[in-house]
Amino acid sequence: MGFMTQKEMAPLPDVHQLSDEQTTLTVEHLNLYYGNKQALNDISIRIPKNQVTALIGPSGCGKSTLLRCFNRMNDLVDDCRTEGDIRLNGMPINDPQLDVAVLRRRIGMVFQRPNPFPKSIYENVIYGLRLQGLRDRRLLDDAVERALRAAALWHEVKDRLSDNALTLSSGQQQRLVIARAIAIEPEVLLLDEPTSALDPISTLIVEELMGTLKQHFTLVLVTHNMQQAARVSDYTAFINQGKLIEYNRTDDLFTSPTQRRTEDYITGRFG
């Protein structure tokens, strides 16, 4: 796969030596509470630019909660509060003066199950662009083709852009959702178990797509599939009980974990 070749050709910097220029998201001493229950405990992590970072851990460990901190999806949860600092290229994400809609244009998200709108394929892709006020048909056409090509879907749908998106297969729908997310050219793409509802062939297509997308975007992936994390990610963070247990280059974490809990998890002793 292309991204494996790139990983082999260019040694990745150590997670503890990432400069600000190499970092897209910076998290420092993050705590998150649902009411009186603490879900994230003193998490500090740097997410490198133009790489795939996987968040792994057992169900309920806090990895999806952490992911949703990056675009403030947790704001939608009643009685949720956060402490600490999260920055997107230096911009404080939790600033109460920040327009969350602007943040979510800079940080796109793809969920576990494909969620295309019950509109045409074309209208799905341009949805975010229309919200931004873009009306020029030529520019919209160009954006649709560019996004669908980037999502490896263009050749499958270019002659049926007016068809309802719900007529696509589940794998095609998920790639359409990715195209919709990247059409507005975000800096970061959050992927919350994006292949868990897909068949093996569709899963492989999406995994290969991640290797291409990271050339233009920073990707953060939540996955229960450790083999998937090992295949597609450059860096992996192991989270358990709301704490960051270990964070390292993926190859190092899976072959030479420094924490016993990490080794126990990746070898199947618990989780």
From Swiss-Prot:
<comment type="subunit">
    <text>The complex is composed of two ATP-binding proteins (PstB), two transmembrane proteins (PstC and PstA) and a solute-binding protein (PstS).</text>
</comment>
<comment type="function">
    <text>Part of the ABC transporter complex PstSACB involved in phosphate import. Responsible for energy coupling to the transport system.</text>
</comment>
<dbReference type="InterPro" id="IPR027417">
    <property type="entry name" value="P-loop_NTPase"/>
</dbReference>
<keyword id="KW-0067">ATP-binding</keyword>
<keyword id="KW-0997">Cell inner membrane</keyword>
<dbReference type="GO" id="GO:0015415">
    <property type="term" value="F:ATPase-coupled phosphate ion transmembrane transporter activity"/>
</dbReference>
<dbReference type="InterPro" id="IPR003439">
    <property type="entry name" value="ABC_transporter-like_ATP-bd"/>
</dbReference>
<dbReference type="InterPro" id="IPR005670">
    <property type="entry name" value="PstB-like"/>
</dbReference>
<dbReference type="InterPro" id="IPR003593">
    <property type="entry name" value="AAA+_ATPase"/>
</dbReference>
<dbReference type="GO" id="GO:0005524">
    <property type="term" value="F:ATP binding"/>
</dbReference>
<feature type="domain" description="ABC transporter">
    <location>
        <begin position="25"/>
        <end position="266"/>
    </location>
</feature>
<dbReference type="Pfam" id="PF00005">
    <property type="entry name" value="ABC_tran"/>
</dbReference>
<dbReference type="InterPro" id="IPR017871">
    <property type="entry name" value="ABC_transporter-like_CS"/>
</dbReference>
<feature type="binding site">
    <location>
        <begin position="57"/>
        <end position="64"/>
    </location>
    <ligand>
        <name>ATP</name>
    </ligand>
</feature>
<keyword id="KW-0472">Membrane</keyword>
<dbReference type="GO" id="GO:0016887">
    <property type="term" value="F:ATP hydrolysis activity"/>
</dbReference>
<dbReference type="GO" id="GO:0035435">
    <property type="term" value="P:phosphate ion transmembrane transport"/>
</dbReference>
<comment type="similarity">
    <text>Belongs to the ABC transporter superfamily. Phosphate importer (TC 3.A.1.7) family.</text>
</comment>
<dbReference type="GO" id="GO:0005886">
    <property type="term" value="C:plasma membrane"/>
</dbReference>
<protein>
    <recommendedName>
        <fullName>Phosphate import ATP-binding protein PstB 1</fullName>
        <ecNumber>7.3.2.1</ecNumber>
    </recommendedName>
</protein>
<keyword id="KW-0592">Phosphate transport</keyword>
<keyword id="KW-0547">Nucleotide-binding</keyword>
<keyword id="KW-1003">Cell membrane</keyword>
<keyword id="KW-1278">Translocase</keyword>
<keyword id="KW-0813">Transport</keyword>
